[in-house]
From Swiss-Prot:
The gene is nusB. Residues 20-41 are annotated as: Disordered. The keyword Transcription applies. SUPFAM superfamilies: NusB-like. It comes from Polaromonas sp. (strain JS666 / ATCC BAA-500). It holds the Pfam family NusB. This is Transcription antitermination protein NusB. Involved in transcription antitermination. Required for transcription of ribosomal RNA (rRNA) genes. Binds specifically to the boxA antiterminator sequence of the ribosomal RNA (rrn) operons. One of its GO terms (cellular component) is cytosol. Keywords: RNA-binding, Transcription, Transcription antitermination, Transcription regulation. One of its GO terms (biological process) is transcription antitermination.
Amino acid sequence: MHKPLFQKTFITNRRFMAEPLNKPKRPPQIRTGLTDTGVKKAADKSARTRAREFALQALYQHLVGRNDADSIDAFTRDLVGFHKADSAHYDALLHGCIEGASALDAVITPLLDRPMAEISPVEHAVLWMGAYEFRQCLDVPYRVVINECIELAKAFGGTDGHKYVNGVLHKMAPSLRAAEVAADQTK
């Protein structure tokens, strides 16, 4: 007997299609650092991005649970993956946002179209982080701050929370990073 050169393959419309038996297999597709949902894979995240994620979770605990910074800090440092985060940036964000909460709220509140009480805790924490980084982390370009905050809001916030965060931070940037925004607009 001879070996068949083709095998029948079932197609959804109940027809068969001839397919070669020795058809070469395609190599698996190499993904470029994104999951199926478009979120960065954990292996591709920078230490600062990880620090922002842990800081956001810690600030959420502070806003919702009213826990003190030291107990939140101890809890967060025990979480899986924290060793890959930039702990200095995490400390600056967590303690800086909690200690400067009233000053950060004073910067954020005039830019809101609703009372602060109606902002979700995730968006509130992301806005705190954005305002803090605008004021204190001058080595981070303002566009990076906005982008990182948008990504945090997409990953942890409500459906359209990232759009709201984007709008507020774009209004905030010219007042806190005036020279940088002006230089960027002249390009």
